[in-house]
């Protein structure tokens, strides 16, 4: 077999390394991260769902003053039946809640870490030297996301495992495993539709129907659960994502939005100031042009030159990343797929040969990856991006693309010549430098969010008032120890004051930020006139990016 995975199954001996990896990862998390690490609101939201299910046995939230529930804009929504639920999928947090009941805090990261270990198990079946796989995986944002309660790595695991089963002829089982990933990430619906289209074009009817048969039960069960829980088969996220924060748009503005999405999600990596965009295009265009060579060994000199440019450019981007100290904000402008994962160079440099490879599995995987990359930017909402790290919307296919990239480099002879080896080493080094920065940022930010949470929890008052939409998700334990009142509008402020007076609450914790204000100075003055600060505020910072003021306010006699 010239490409893809080898036929032998995964033995117990081969599982030893992934098991050791999982244990070491959990020990790393225990040593350097809080028990419930919070990077941004998205994964903090999932921790809130987890806590709510653990304490109340429900994915729906109760609040003594529903008008002041910390909705965080669209992060939490009220259903037609009046119940409040998260915008995000509840299924991973619920599974994690059950694990935490059994294993305590160690259960928070168990699913992501074990998922990455399983990805390792499958990827180590790839032909060739194993260290190449390990280095390439280390140079991608997989380890970073395995240290957070987030669905990216479990979803990537289902895709990678399904691909391995698909290659081995276990098509029905592959369909079932793939569809299990639908419970994690909605992007897999797109990936599944693309795969169906490819199989139809190849007239692989038998394979397609077997895959669909395996996928039918998990997919139907998900649609049924979403309908029963949320009144919509797409769930809350799937049914509202496209309209969140999106203004009315003309055809021209929508066209510009799509073009921006392609740049944002495939290329952008703003660590070189105003030169970032020109440098990114200068790095990618030669590699993409070389990828149109009619064979792996054709245009060899041009491929090597393009590879050198790509490797040197991504090394420059990676080195410049370390000068950035705003660990959160820089993550909003550094997630272009091909710059942020330089080990995908082999995919770009050998694009056409991979698409036309004689091995049907390799060609199908390459076509699936390319079509997914080209379709997803049309579907993403640029008004609902927020802070992230790396190309998170492509995490699901990155392991498969890494396999294709290494395979392409082998076939193109990059591992035999000095120049080719240097290109591969430089791309791997660039990726590892980026991921070391990511883990450093993760340790810093999660420590800061934990400090902010502990500061609020340490104050004995049981009510928290804030106009910051992201406070509950950045401090996910607080809503279950105290009542949080959101005052992001004049109406909410009035409702909060009425609630405080109705419940005879004479003092509360006020959390503000000089950088993000939803209420005006006049509205804040109205609140502080009735409940003046009882002392100087405590100033806290998260990730050198966000400043917070925490103070106690007490009603005047």
Regions flagged by a language model, labelled:
Residues 68-80, 230-354:
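Membrane-lumen/periplasm interface segments of multi-pass, membrane-embedded glycan/lipid transferases
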Residues 388, 422-478, 485:
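Membrane-embedded, lumen/periplasm-facing catalytic core of multi-pass transferases
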Residues 144-155:
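Short acidic/glycine- and proline-prone juxtamembrane loop motifs at membrane-interface regions
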Residues 184, 329-347, 364, 385-412:
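Hydrophobic/aromatic-rich transmembrane helices and adjacent perimembrane loops
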């Amino acid at each position: 077999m010239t490409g893809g995975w080898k036929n032998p199954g995964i033995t117990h001996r081969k599982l030893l390394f992934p098991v050791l990896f999982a244990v070491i990862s959990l020990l790393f998390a225990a040593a350097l991260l809080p028990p419930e690490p919070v990077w941004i609101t998205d994964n903090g939201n999932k921790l809130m769902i987890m806590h709510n299910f653990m304490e109340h046995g429900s994915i729906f939230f109760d609040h003594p003053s529903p008008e002041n529930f910390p909705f965080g804009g669209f992060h939490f929504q009220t259903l037609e039946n009046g119940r409040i639920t998260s915008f995000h999928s509840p299924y991973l947090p619920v599974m994690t809640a059950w694990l935490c009941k059994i294993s305590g805090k160690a259960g928070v990261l168990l699913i992501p870490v074990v998922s990455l270990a399983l990805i390792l198990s499958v990827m180590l079946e790839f032909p060739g030297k194993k260290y190449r796989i390990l280095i390439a995986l280390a140079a991608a944002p997989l380890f970073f996301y395995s240290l957070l309660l987030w669905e990216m790595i479990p979803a990537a695991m289902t895709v990678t495992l399904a691909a391995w089963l698909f290659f081995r002829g276990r098509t029905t089982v592959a369909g079932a495993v793939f569809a299990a990933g639908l419970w994690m990430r909605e992007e897999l619906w797109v990936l599944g539709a693309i795969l169906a289209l490819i199989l139809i074009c190849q007239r692989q009817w038998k394979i397609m129907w077997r895959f669909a048969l395996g996928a039918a039960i998990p997919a139907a069960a998900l649609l049924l659960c979403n309908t029963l829980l949320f009144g919509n088969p797409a769930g809350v996220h799937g049914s509202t994502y496209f309209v969140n924060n999106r203004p009315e748009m003309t055809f021209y503005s929508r066209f510009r939005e799509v073009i921006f999405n392609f740049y944002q999600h495939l290329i952008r990596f703003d660590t070189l100031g105003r030169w970032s965009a020109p440098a990114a295009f200068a790095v990618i265009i030669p590699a993409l042009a070389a990828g149109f060579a009619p064979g792996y060994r054709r245009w060899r000199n041009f491929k090597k030159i393009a590879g050198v440019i790509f490797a040197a450019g991504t090394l420059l981007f990676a080195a410049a990343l370390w000068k950035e100290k705003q660990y959160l904000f820089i993550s909003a402008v550094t997630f272009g797929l091909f710059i942020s994962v330089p080990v995908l160079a082999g995919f770009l440099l050998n694009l056409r040969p991979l698409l036309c490879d004689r091995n049907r599995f390799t060609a199908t995987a390459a076509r699936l990856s390319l079509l997914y990359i080209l379709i997803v930017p049309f579907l993403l909402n640029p008004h609902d991006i927020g802070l992230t790290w790396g190309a998170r919307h492509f995490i699901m296919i990155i392991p498969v693309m890494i396999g294709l990239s290494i395979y392409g480099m082998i076939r193109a002879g990059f591992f035999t010549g000095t120049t080719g080896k240097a290109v591969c080493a430089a791309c791997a080094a660039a990726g590892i430098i980026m991921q070391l920065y990511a883990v450093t940022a993760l340790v810093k930010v999660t420590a800061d969010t934990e400090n902010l949470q502990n500061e609020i929890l340490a104050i004995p008052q049981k009510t928290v008032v804030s106009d910051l939409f992201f406070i509950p998700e950045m401090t996910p334990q607080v809503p279950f120890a105290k009542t949080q009142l959101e005052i992001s509008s004049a109406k909410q402020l009035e409702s909060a004051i009425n609630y405080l007076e109705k419940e005879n609450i004479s003092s509360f914790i006020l959390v503000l930020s000089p950088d993000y204000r939803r209420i005006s100075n006049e509205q804040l003055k109205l609140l502080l006139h009735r409940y003046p600060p009882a002392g100087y505020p405590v100033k806290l910072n998260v990730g050198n990016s966000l400043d917070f003021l925490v103070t106690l306010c007490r009603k005047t006699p």
